[in-house]
From Swiss-Prot:
Signal peptide: none annotated. It comes from the Eukaryota. This is Small ribosomal subunit protein uS14c. It holds the Pfam family Ribosomal_S14. Its main location: plastid. Belongs to the universal ribosomal protein uS14 family. One of its GO terms (biological process) is translation. The lineage of its organism: Eukaryota, Viridiplantae, Streptophyta, Embryophyta, Tracheophyta. NCBIfam families: PRK08881.1 (NF006477).
Amino acid sequence: MARKSLIQREKGRLKLENKYHFIRRSSKNEISKVPSLSDKWEIYGKLESPPRNSAPTRLRRRCFYTGRPRANYRDFGLCGHILREMVNACLLPGATRSSW
């Protein structure tokens, strides 16, 4: 189990990312449209104004069940340990153990 403080920190980052998503996207679109370098620098300044934790690269995908940050499978939202346990217990529909 991940520490609860880390999970809450990640939730806060997700809220910030959703809040500033439109500002970042519009600034990046403006940069590609503006031909002059001085105007681009001004827009880069706007990109630096939102908080650091609002950047999408600061987010980390976590296991839905345990909060573990590593070995996550996007399709299920689970880490490898829990995924294996759930497949063995036949709790995930459509997922089977491989055998050859």
